[in-house]
């Protein structure tokens, strides 16, 4: 165990050394002991948090998230469910019809024995009593002694909680019947960075945490099997598939067992428990272990295991090495949700859906947890990038998408439908502030993918692949921002690309280029293109003559101040002068008579986000 943790520490130090120019980061190291009553779903715990203030600021208060308090009538989450036009169907009852829905918040109907609850009963700092108060899901602690820059303090608390009825992500008795899905269950230190405290109320969307180490002991009924973040420290005492080969598990007359987990260099700790969990374990060639915990639908859960080992290897190669000693796929929660070193996901799905969910959640281990952008502020950097590599894995490893198909057509169509709906909002919108869940989902999952596909279109696939790998190398464990990523892309490609980040993600501008005019100029042909919308793009254009021979014409975008490699190497390429965005039209001459032209096509493989492809074709 010490060798594993030492290797992880060396790995983290190496990555940190690469990115010394990044801002400082706070550190929160947790020691927690919690006792769960599995009959009434209530628990009590203690927490010792060693907080390292690496900032240049003196901190006189600190804040904690109390996420479970969102699952109470009249909470902000409850209010949002009653006001948003398209609430999450899992969180509401429909008193009307599918055509004319009348939504009722499930949270509003919770009884006192069904609500979520997280309450602090005592709080101290370095042995001195601390004053605290809470409003909904945020706890404010006024410190008796300010935390000076570059100093540590120890915060101790006792707390009690109640696991809510399963409504979203965490709770009791999941749709698959898993007893406990314990995500965001403990008082969690709010992130403090160069922007200050991120005291965001929990409304059901994304998270942003503080890096730290977790030492967690969980005591509950001895018949339960526990799975979660971290490495189990007492496997030969607990058994349940954790034990070393050949070890005989000691019997106990006690009614409870205490499970001891340690997770290093993570920003969250999640667990699930059920007395009927089956546990399958696989050891990879590098010594890392992959775990599967499930209680129902064993055929599909068995079937996905060899596939997920292949996907794990694919992600290691595609992005970079997974640094932690293990990862667990756990039946629990609703849908699928990513956490530190594990995922909770529903199991009652068809194989294609289950393996797709597992692939998506595993990909989050790199983007949501290892790179760890502020996903509340930039959900598209997590969900979009995750969906991008999920889609590639589904095509290249799982073969769920035919090899001859362009894999991102679904993302484009989803984006196009959002544009047509008139509901699109700038993708820089905070995840909690979207007017509709529809606009949020398309922006985060689909437009986030398209951000990468359009970089591929602008600078070439090889440059994009190098960008993703370098992004991992330079920003693992560093909470990168959109600007950090685009600067990597600029360095790799040699292009100027800040404008693309601004235009595509910070506005709702769209692209529409058209073939405006095709005219004879003696033995040459003058082709005039027109920009009809505000989003700039370079242009790929195919000209096919009557003999069936195709010529590729590339029109660079001036503001990139560069050219991409030939993305169609099987066709001769002509590079014409760059097109400046301020010019609505662009004309160039082709050394081919008009009467010999059969067709002209903009973006022949439909790789750009042009919203109107009908005006991209000229045929005689």
Where on the chain are the PLM-derived regions?
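A surface-exposed beta-strand-loop module
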Residues: 52, 58, 91-92, 97-177, ...
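Hydrophobic alpha-helical and helix-loop surface patches within well-folded domains
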Residues: 27-28, 66, 261, 291-528
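Short, hydrophobic/aromatic-enriched beta-strand segments in well-ordered soluble domains
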Residues: 47-49, 53, 66, 151-165, ...
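Solvent-exposed beta-hairpin/edge-strand motifs
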Residues: 61-128, 182-183, 219, 223-224, ...
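Glycine/proline-rich low-complexity spacer/linker segments in large multi-domain proteins
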Residues: 76-88, 160-214, 605-620
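N-terminal, polar/Ser/Thr-rich
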Residues: 19-44, 56, 73, 498-499, ...
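Hydrophobic helix-coil surface modules that form long, contiguous segments used
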Residues: 188-196, 203-359, 388
């Amino acid at each position: 165990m010490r060798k594993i943790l030492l290797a992880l520490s060396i790995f983290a130090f190496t990555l940190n050394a690469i990115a010394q120019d990044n801002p400082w980061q706070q550190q929160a190291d947790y020691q927690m002991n919690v006792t769960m009553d599995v009959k009434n779903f209530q628990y009590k715990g203690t927490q010792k948090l060693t907080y390292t203030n690496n900032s240049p600021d003196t901190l006189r208060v600190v804040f904690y998230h109390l996420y479970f308090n969102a699952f109470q009538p009249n909470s902000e989450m409850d209010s949002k469910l009653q006001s948003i036009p398209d609430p999450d169907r899992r969180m509401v009852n429909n008193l009307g019809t599918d055509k004319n829905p009348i939504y009722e918040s499930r949270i509003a109907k919770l009884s006192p024995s069904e609500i979520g609850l997280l309450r602090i009963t005592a709080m101290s700092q370095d042995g001195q009593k601390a004053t605290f108060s809470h409003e909904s899901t945020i706890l404010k602690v006024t410190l008796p002694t300010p935390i000076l820059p570059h100093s540590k303090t120890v915060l101790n608390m006792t707390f009690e909680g109640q696991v809510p009825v399963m409504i979203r992500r965490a709770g009791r008795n999941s749709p698959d019947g898993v007893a406990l899905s314990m995500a965001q269950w403990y008082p969690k230190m709010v992130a403090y960075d160069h922007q200050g405290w991120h005291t965001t109320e929990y409304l059901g969307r994304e998270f942003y945490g503080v890096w730290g180490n977790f030492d967690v002991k969980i005591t509950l009924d001895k018949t339960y099997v526990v799975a979660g973040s971290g490495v189990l420290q007492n496997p030969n005492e607990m058994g349940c598939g954790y034990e070393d080969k050949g070890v005989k598990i000691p019997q106990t007359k006690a009614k409870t067992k205490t499970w001891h987990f340690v997770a290093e260099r993570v920003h969250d700790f999640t667990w699930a428990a059920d007395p009927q969990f089956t546990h399958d374990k696989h050891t990879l060639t590098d010594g890392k272990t992959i775990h599967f915990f499930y209680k129902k639908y064993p055929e599909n859960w068995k079937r996905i295991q060899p596939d997920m080992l292949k996907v794990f290897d694919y992600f290691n190669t595609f992005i970079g090495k997974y640094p932690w000693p293990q990862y667990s796929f756990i039946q629990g929660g609703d849908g699928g949700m990513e956490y530190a070193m594990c995922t909770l996901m529903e199991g009652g799905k068809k194989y294609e859906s289950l393996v797709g969910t597992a692939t998506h959640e595993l990909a989050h281990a790199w983007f949501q947890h290892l790179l760890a952008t502020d996903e509340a502020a930039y959900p598209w950097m997590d969900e979009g990038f995750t969906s991008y590599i999920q889609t590639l894995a589904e095509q290249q490893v799982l073969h769920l998408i035919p090899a001859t198909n362009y894999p991102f057509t679904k993302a484009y169509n989803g984006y196009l439908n959002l544009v047509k709906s008139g509901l699109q909002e700038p993708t820089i919108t905070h995840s909690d502030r979207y007017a509709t869940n529809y606009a949020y989902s398309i922006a985060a999952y689909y437009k986030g993918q398209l951000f990468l596909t359009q970089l591929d279109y602008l600078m070439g696939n090889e440059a994009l692949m190098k960008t993703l790998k370098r992004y991992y190398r330079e920003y693992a464990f560093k909470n990168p921002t959109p600007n950090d990523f685009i600067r990597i892309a600029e360095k790799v490609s040699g292009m100027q690309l800040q404008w693309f980040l601004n235009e595509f993600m910070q506005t709702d501008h769209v692209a529409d280029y058209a073939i405006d005019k095709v005219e004879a100029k003696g033995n040459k042909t003058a082709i005039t293109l027109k920009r009809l919308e505000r989003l700039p793009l370079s242009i790929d254009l195919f000209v096919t003559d009557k003999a069936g021979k195709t010529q590729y014409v590339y029109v660079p975008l001036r503001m990139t101040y560069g050219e991409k490699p030939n993305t169609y190497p099987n066709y001769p390429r002509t590079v014409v002068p760059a097109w400046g965005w301020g010019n609505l039209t662009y004309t160039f001459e082709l050394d081919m008579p008009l009467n010999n032209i059969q067709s002209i096509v903009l973006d022949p493989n439909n790789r750009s986000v042009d919203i109107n492809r009908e005006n991209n074709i000229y045929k005689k």
